[in-house]
Design a protein with these regions (language model features):
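Helix-turn-helix
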Residues: 1-35
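Hydrophobic/aromatic-rich alpha-helical bundle segments in the mid-to-C-terminal region
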Residues: 96, 118-170, 179-188
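A short secondary-structure junction motif
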Residues: 39-47, 78, 109, 113, ...
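Amphipathic alpha-helical packing segments from all-alpha helical-bundle domains
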Residues: 62, 73, 83-85, 93-122, ...
Length: 188
């Protein structure tokens, strides 16, 4: 309710505990923020999603739709989105931690799968460039923004989330390959 600007004394009062009790478990405010990150963000990440995305026996479109249906169910919650936005506005590291996590556990995996589906070199042979990574952020960010409109701005899109995800995946899979063929260099 007060974001990350509140002090531990006020937090203790709201929780009905003493401030020393908070410091017993969290020696610093940074430790408390890291615990919030782990609880709010990392516990929402399902490691099975990475297995799903890597399952080349299933069509890529099907894997991406299944992933984003699960992922959006986990993060399109007012508290999750508010904490994410407030921490970003305050310059806290939570956002940088999460962005790094998403790049490592999701976007690079999607880049690899899209490359393989389009006969491009694997990321092991030709690492993902900053330009290529931004193409996948564009795709991912579009889906994320649906949640902001619905949960934060309280202006739900007129298209169902399922249809929006399917359309986003289709647009990426059909539109991105020509750009990737220009952006991804041949292996050396």
């Amino acid at each position: 309710e007060v974001g990350f600007d509140g002090g531990t004394r006020e937090l203790a009062r709201r929780l009905g505990v003493t401030q020393p009790l908070i410091y017993r478990y969290f020696p610093s405010k940074e430790d408390l923020i890291r615990a919030v990150y782990e609880e709010v963000y990392l516990t929402q990440w399902d490691p099975a999603w990475e297995v799903l995305l890597a399952d080349a026996a299933r069509p890529l479109r099907e894997r991406l739709i299944a992933f984003y249906e699960g992922y959006t169910a986990a993060i399109f919650k007012p508290d999750w989105l508010r904490i994410y936005l407030f921490s970003g506005l305050r310059g806290l590291e939570i956002n940088r931690w999460w962005i790094t996590f998403v790049e490592q556990h999701l976007l690079r995996q999607i880049a690899e799968a899209v490359r393989l589906d389009n006969g491009l070199p694997s990321t092991a042979k030709t690492p993902v460039s900053a330009e290529e990574l931004e193409l996948f952020w564009m795709f991912h960010g579009g889906i994320f923004y649906y949640g902001l409109r619905r949960e934060v701005y309280l202006k739900p899109p007129e298209l169902s989330l399922g249809r929006f995800i399917a359309n986003s995946v289709d647009a990426m899979l059909l539109g991105l390959p020509p750009v990737l063929k220009r952006v991804v260099p041949a292996p050396t």
